[in-house]
Amino acid sequence: MKYLQALIVVLIFSSCEKDEIPVAYIAPELQQGTFITQIEMSSDYRYRTYYDLETDMVVARHRKRDWDLGFSSVEGDQRIRLNSSRLMSVYRIDGVPFEDIGSVQGEGPLYDRADGTEAALDDWQSGDGVYVINRGYDAEVNDMGKVKVELQSMDATGFTLRYAVLGSSDIQEVFVPKDETVNMVMLSFDEGVQNLEPPKEDWDILFTHYTLFFDELFGQQNIQYLVAGALINPYQVEAQDLDLTEFDDIDVDYLQGVDLTSEEDVIGYDWKEFTLIGESYAILDNAYAIRTVEGNDYKFQFTNFLDENGERGAPTFQAALVD
């Protein structure tokens, strides 16, 4: 990331009613010219908000506390993701029966990488598949507790596992089905299987809190931060941070020389920085190229992070189709 000073440890949350707002997908009628949009994440970043560039619409939104694990729906893919918007982590345990685990132990803490290249649970089929999972923090900064999980099997139809609150003998068994229309199906340790993510063909950008992990930073080992930013859809979306930040100068000819990437945090968080003077946010020079699920190229630039009342968590951007 370009601006380490932009790292912000954000653990200030508040509760709200469960709010999912699926919006029916409409075949995109591409806008001509520049459009300006503001996304409401809320000042405590309680929401994970899915946005589609072609329609300039929020297609779904849910609270970050609504799920714990995300199970890949890609055919043959065994990946299981943590809910990175809660600073979750795991400890891998080998050689200890599931029923005997009563405390945090094993190799860890392990985290998912924000770029999507590695997940803490990636090797679950190579060992015993037993983990202690730290569920992180809810919207009010309450510790959501810890569970032990045994990931048992995966086939073409889904995943089988069992879990229990750490220290409890009440073991829950669950099957999480694959759904080819989405990237992943979620599981809440409180509410069971959750269908929260919109169809993978319907969105391009996820505005959310997410965990940023460093093996080493400023001489400290294994540093984790919660940051507020934008992640791209791992299904077919590509993007790149541009050297040219004059929005009007970004055209087809310029983008032909840009190499796009599928790293999910390529847009990320560091288009802004926190300023101690006034305790506010400054927008840094930024511009991005984004190729959508449909294969259309857009130029994209953040212009603000505050709402009309000066509250954070309301990223505003301008975007335009480049053709």
What are the residue ranges of the model-derived segments?
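C-terminal motif of bacterial Sec signal peptides marking the signal peptidase cleavage site
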Residues: I12-S15
